[in-house]
Amino acid sequence: MLLLLSPAKSLDYTSPLPPLEATAPRFAEEALATAQAAAKLSARKLAGLMGISDKLAKLNAGRYADFAGQEERPALYAFSGDVYVGFEAKTLDEPAIGFAQDHVRILSGLYGLLRPLDLIRPYRLEMGTRWAPGRKKNLYQLWGSKISDALAADLLGEGSDVIVNCASKEYWHAVDQAPPKGIRIITMDFRELAPQGLIFNSFGAKRARGMMARWMCEHRITDPEGLKGFDSDGYAYSAEGSDDSTWRFVKTR
């Protein structure tokens, strides 16, 4: 079983790291080629493509201009957005991190598919960006079936046929455009109970995705049915609103 997460825009390349054995991304060459192509874009062009401030655009233009010289850090510790606040990797023990390496995957516009301990350089490139190197119109075209093929290979290696989707729609589309055959896909839907009824809280859902990934690693869950026991931060599985392909979890407090 593999659980998929989105990456994060926020990065942390300064906090101390625990002792760990980092790994190399499988699509490192593709990432370098894309970064080199992005280095040819002006900061102004990057700002327009990514919808970011001039300051952020200049920062990322500089990163791409010297991409090979940028510091590397394991993906799980480099990303620091809401999902990774929920995951809180720095407080997990070594066996749980090892389990994450085997059972968690992070989707990426630049790197395609990452294991938690794969080394990455700082970047900003959302999967939905309407740009790609060469004659491709966007990153979905660039990646094609590569991400799904890699997921299928990883699942085959562990003798499993289940993907737990805790990624955003933007990133999940990179898999769903060419879904791996013969694989059961379960999408997690996180809601909150409010006075006006059930609501979708984007911030809360992102944190919940990370918390579920952490909970899975802490409890060494390898059967999706075990995830129905997820109870972090007041969440509980709800049969109402769930079906075979979508499982709803509701936060009641």
Curated annotation (Swiss-Prot):
Pfam families: H2O2_YaaD
Any Gene Ontology biological process: response to hydroperoxide
A GO CC term attached to the entry: cytosol
Cited InterPro entries: YaaA
Listed PANTHER family: PEROXIDE STRESS RESISTANCE PROTEIN YAAA (PTHR30283:SF4), PEROXIDE STRESS RESPONSE PROTEIN YAAA (PTHR30283)
Family stated for the protein in its record: Belongs to the UPF0246 family.
Protein's UniProt name: UPF0246 protein Swit_4565
Organism in which the protein naturally occurs: Rhizorhabdus wittichii (strain DSM 6014 / CCUG 31198 / JCM 15750 / NBRC 105917 / EY 4224 / RW1) (Sphingomonas wittichii)
